[in-house]
Amino acid sequence: MSLRILLVGNGGREHALAWKLAQSPLVERIFVAPGNGGTDNPQGKIENIAIGSSQKDFAKLVEFAQSKDVGLVIPGPEQPLVEGIETHFRKVGIPVFGPSEKAAVMEGSKTFSKDFMKKHNIPTAAFENFTDYNKAVDYVKKVGHRVVIKASGLAAGKGVLIPTSTEEAIAAVKEVMQDKAFGEAGDEVVIEEFLEGDELSILAFSDGYTVVDMPPAQDHKRIGDGDQGLNTGGMGAYCPAPIGTPALLQEIKESILQPTIDGMRRDGIPFVGMLFTGIMLTPDGKPKVLEYNVRFGDPETQTILPLLSDDTDLAEVMLACVERRLDAVTLRVKPDAHAVTVVMSAGGYPESYKKGDAITVGGLPEQTYIFHAGTASENGQVITAGGRVIASTAVAPTLKDAVAQAYKGADAVEFNGKYNRKDIAYKAFRDAEKTSGGITYAQAGVSIDNGNKLVQQIKEKVKSTARPGTDSVIGGFGGLFDLKAAGFRDPLLVGATDGVGTKLKIAQSIDKHDTVGIDLVAMNVNDLVVQGAEPLVFLDYYATGKLDVNAAAAFVGGVADGCIQAGCALIGGETAEMPGIYYGNDYDANGTSIGAVERDAVLPRMDEIAKGDAILGLASSGVHSNGFSLVRKIIEHAGLTYTDACPWDQSKSLGEALLTPTRIYVKQLLPVINAKLTSALAHITGGGLVENIPRILPENYSAKIDVSTWPLPPVFQWLGKAGNVPKEDISKTLNMGIGMILVVKQEKVAEVTQLLEKVGEKVYQIGEIVPDNDVDEKTVLINTENWY
């Protein structure tokens, strides 16, 4: 394959891209428009062309690309992408590594991107968007925290103001919205919470489905050492940043990068190209999005590309992205390697500066590279032509060595008025000094203090579950139960253990955790009651990568609510913080319930079940806690998010509707059980009616169920239609509106129905017991054709 590439732009980023792409055996020629003094090398693979990168140049660029049989276009800067360069080339059949105009709005409009993050529950600073100056000022006056003022549109990286007081914030709003310091970019502003912490730059390739992130980098925006002085386009960077631990990067990928790519696709603006996300790592260790960029960062690109492994072909990776097959190519970085970039600027930058000074470059250390930015070639001499002129990047086995090498490279560059910072990567060494005294348990990712806070928050709630036989005091090593005090004569103990499953993913996505606590109890106690047992005690296990005290407290509060509904005591549990096993705030939960049943009351009594016995059904509250892998797949297929309005209940979000907790059937069934009015009960969980009813049937008998005897809840109608799920399949996965069934003698149906209706149950007579030889399956469903 002989690939010709058109690379649009003229900065250090574009030189680094051209340098790396030229190493690919796939690449025959790289045309850089307009390029700089470093990309002007017609004797090699790289050649400048005298066409600009602004919107008025798009037609010329397309014409040139067609004339040269270009097979891939790579826009470097954000402006052409925001202005729709991808559309111009797509119309003539030339693929572009970069997002469409609609997708590029993620960088082109900060208000759009903030609203997107809010919609898709992507962690970011609290914010409000404004087009009205007076309303913006009123908000600044009333808000109770320090703020950042951002011009919504593109402002060449300068449209962010960080005031230190309310007065300064009001002045900043005026500067942006009324004085038009950033032109039309300031017609709309984002006023957001000021976040403190360390920043990370995460560059990630995406084909619209898969996302592959590069090692985390940190850049240096301020002109002066110690991050003092005016903002710049970036005075240096280093990679990988030590604070970007594997656990943190996994959390960023799962809570930010993948949800961003998935959300854009579902919103009809799939993202193809390089997603560059600015992350703030707050003091509590949580990553939050500062901003999205839809292209390679500068100077991060100059720092990261030299770290790609020798078997990683950048051209092949980019082609894989545009061909939607990123998961099929190799993308690796060199092991045990560090890179540092030192940017050299013209004297006076970022304010007024001189151009036209001659540049010379002497001998460089091994694995040290020079990338041109604001340079031009004039009569064979490279001269200064911009504010950030040139950069030295070095790769070495240690960060310390990479810093030393990069500065040696910078020393080899000479031009009049040259300036560079002397402290690139200082944050990495500062962080190392902080931990030199030894590693604490908290630094390993486990907070004893947070665990203690959780216990204090849930103590009273747990205490409210006390019942005869126990005291429900937490904080010890377990719990005791006095069967005699609970009134049992000759009991058998019955145990059940279960979890909530992938329903937890929905709870985590919309930050609502109380109802899944009820689910956990329900899944266990319903399995006890079908054995005739009264639930007595409950214990929960909650495991997470990083303990969010409020989320865990809400979850345990839900567990306590479920215990109260079931009449059992929450006597203990375990909260495990396990970074590396779980990532970020993701969690899993399991519960165990112990109950008791008198020896002569154990269910099912299969010897009593006979032909003609009635099967009664009690309604479910919805999907309950099984089948959510199918449910989530249907939601994805439908292109919905959990914050969208629920299709079958517009008063709720989709996530809220799906989190309706599993019904607990204990208190309404115990009187029926104690009166020996039922011979068997079945909890309809995973496997649906088809798989669960056979558990209670004796040999030679089957169940015949008429699904027209109860109304199919709207949630199941919608899921079936939206996923086009075969009825045979959905009936083996979801409960379809019946959460519990009872086998009852025909002569007892009226009495059982009356008992259950007294406590508010709606009872449906849904089928009967039939001999095996009358049907083909152990559970036969009829009239399913009318479901949806």
From Swiss-Prot:
Keywords attached to this entry: ATP-binding, Cytoplasm, Ligase, Magnesium, Manganese, Metal-binding, Multifunctional enzyme, Nucleotide-binding, Purine biosynthesis
Domain of life: Eukaryota
GO biological process, one term: purine nucleotide biosynthetic process
Cysteines joined through disulfide linkages: none
Subcellular location: Cytoplasm, Cytosol
Protein residues bound to Mg(2+): E291, N293
Recorded catalytic activity of this chain's protein: 5-phospho-beta-D-ribosylamine + glycine + ATP = N(1)-(5-phospho-beta-D-ribosyl)glycinamide + ADP + phosphate + H(+); 2-formamido-N(1)-(5-O-phospho-beta-D-ribosyl)acetamidine + ATP = 5-amino-1-(5-phospho-beta-D-ribosyl)imidazole + ADP + phosphate + H(+)
Domain ATP-grasp: 114-323
SUPFAM superfamilies, per the entry: Glutathione synthetase ATP-binding domain-like, PreATP-grasp domain, PurM C-terminal domain-like, PurM N-terminal domain-like, Rudiment single hybrid motif
GO molecular function: ATP binding; metal ion binding; phosphoribosylamine-glycine ligase activity; phosphoribosylformylglycinamidine cyclo-ligase activity
Residues annotated for ATP binding in this entry: 140-201
Functional summary from the UniProt entry: Catalyzes the second and fifth step in the 'de novo' purine biosynthesis pathway; contains phosphoribosylamine--glycine ligase (GARS) and phosphoribosylformylglycinamidine cyclo-ligase (AIRS) activities.
Name recorded for this polypeptide: Bifunctional purine biosynthetic protein ADE1
Organism: Yarrowia lipolytica (strain CLIB 122 / E 150) (Yeast)
Encoding gene (name): ADE1
